[in-house]
Amino acid sequence: MKRLIALCVMVLLLSSCSQKPAFEELADGACSSEQAQLVNKHISAQIDAMAKDDWELAYSLASPTFRSNVGIDQFIFVVSTQYGMLIDNQGYEFNSCTIANKKITQEVAVSSNSEVFNLSYSLSVDGEVLGVDSSSVTLPDSKLET
């Protein structure tokens, strides 16, 4: 019985060691479900922090490159003046997640003041750490009538 328990513990330990980190390889194409889940969790944490005026937390979720170029005061100013929908959001929904050239793009639909804003987030990975590089409001596709 002791051998069986020891064998089970060893198998569990070995199997947990063999798993690759989610962002070890950033292959072009759609994000894996694990990658998308981690990206969504990261962006959710940043949006929720902004909505709670926890600017230090929101800023800490930006990428190291972003933080080295933009100070926290400038970050707060830009978000407050141009991304009020994130602060006053009534919810958000994650759409497509893709990877191209080692960059992750996550589309997010944010509801605020009876409107839906489509944002495109760009994230990078430094080691195994995700960081938001930028977000931009995307315009809906317009259909041309002929």
Language-model segments: what does each one mean?
Residues L13-S16:
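C-terminal motif of bacterial Sec signal peptides marking the signal peptidase cleavage site
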Residues M1-L4:
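Positively charged n-region of N-terminal signal peptides that target proteins for export
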Residues V78-V125, S134-S136:
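Surface-exposed, charged secondary-structure patches
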Residues S18-K52:
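Short, low-complexity N-terminal intrinsically disordered segments enriched in polar/charged residues
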